[in-house]
UniProtKB/Swiss-Prot annotation:
Functional pathway: Porphyrin-containing compound metabolism; heme A biosynthesis; heme A from heme O: step 1/1
Full protein name: Heme A synthase
Organism: Rickettsia bellii (strain OSU 85-389)
Membrane topology, as annotated: Multi-pass membrane protein
Native organism taxonomy: Bacteria, Pseudomonadati, Pseudomonadota, Alphaproteobacteria, Rickettsiales
Stated family: Belongs to the COX15/CtaA family. Type 2 subfamily.
Matching Pfam families: COX15-CtaA
């Protein structure tokens, strides 16, 4: 039965990652405001007939995005953005069901013990918060300025990442072997660096969402400098101000700084793992190197080529991959 628990956790992790990636594509294609109602139960089926499609299109036309951004859009074009948002919402519903139904079964079968149930309930509550946060985010764009709040977008993403983190950590603990390392070997430094790396990845994901929300990837499409300067001229004289977090230039600059900081932390983690001279930790160090390299490369490509959807989606995906490898590393060390 433990194998069934492992398969369930793996399925939930895959579903959450799919939801994150589809959500990212929804943002990149400006599809998020195409469904202007929140119907958690009755909205599980898309329009099928011509009349129902026209009715949904009419609802969309009543909100500012149509007139300000997509005036003259055809029904076929509307169907594309509508179905992307619909798939994103459907994935959210499906993931919730795939989580809660087996959870009830595993608990009453005694596979999930009473001592562990609280953490699973926390994940369930986060799913509920995530659904509300998604609508709260969409609602922010159904106004005169048809653009969702970049802060709400960032929190919507972070909640999804937290859900994934909790599920993946349980998965790793459930199926990975314990590290057999002599007691005289000190793993304190790798543990500290792994915690720091996890924290910095969260910061970077949050900043990345702010970049996406402000379309900040469409400016200063050069690397490593921004307009010939390390610190762009727009923020040199006014660096410490909360208003900067509404400025695409500042947010992009902070995301770049975050990338440099994360790289230093992950490289330090890799070096500390290699010094232990343990085959399993050496394997983790190798995977960390690959994940970091791909993550940095996709980030630079996304910037240089003005945010192509495939590159941006890969960049988001490998942020989750990098987080996963660091969580695996942390779990191995913590539970050794």
């Amino acid at each position: 039965m433990q194998k069934n628990l492992t398969r369930w956790l793996l399925t939930c992790c895959i579903m959450v990652v799919a939801m994150i990636i589809v959500g990212g594509i929804t943002r990149l294609t400006d599809s998020g405001l195409s469904i202007v109602e929140w119907r958690p139960v009755t909205g599980i089926l898309p329009p099928f007939s011509y009349d129902t499609w026209q009715a949904e299109f009419a609802k969309y036309k009543a909100f500012p995005e149509y007139n300000a951004v997509n005036y003259g859009m055809t029904l076929s074009e509307f169907k594309f953005i509508y179905l992307l948002e619909f798939v994103h919402r459907l994935l959210g519903r499906a993931t919730g069901l795939i989580y809660i139904l087996p959870l009830i079964y595993f608990y009453f079968k005694g596979i999930i013990k009473n001592r562990d149930i609280l953490s699973y309930i926390i994940v369930l509550l986060l799913f509920c918060v995530q659904g509300f946060m998604g609508w709260y985010m969409v609602k922010s764009g159904l106004v005169n300025h048809p653009s969702v709040s970049h802060f709400r977008l960032a929190f919507h993403l972070i909640i999804a990442v937290i859900i994934y983190h909790l599920l993946f950590y349980k998965l790793v603990k459930n199926c990975c072997d314990i590290l057999l390392i002599p007691s005289q070997i000190n793993l304190k430094l790798p543990l500290i660096f792994s915690v720091a790396a996890i924290a910095m990845i969260y910061v970077q994901i949050f900043l990345g969402a702010l970049v996406a929300g402000l379309d900040a990837g469409l400016i200063y499409n050069s690397f490593p400098l921004m307009g010939g300067n390390f610190i762009p001229i727009e923020i040199k004289d006014n660096f410490i101000s909360f208003k900067n977090w509404y400025d695409p230039v500042f947010v992009q600059f902070m995301h770049r700084l975050g990338a440099y900081s994360l790289s230093i932390i992950v490289i330090a983690l890799i070096i500390s793992l290699l010094k232990v001279k343990n085959p399993k930790l050496n394997k983790v160090a190798f995977y960390l190197s690959i994940a970091l390299l791909i993550q940095l490369s996709t980030g630079v490509i996304t910037l240089l080529y003005h945010v192509p959807i495939i590159a941006a989606s890969m960049h988001q995906f490998f942020a989750i991959v990098l987080l996963s490898v660091v969580i695996w590393c942390y779990s191995l060390i913590k539970n050794s």
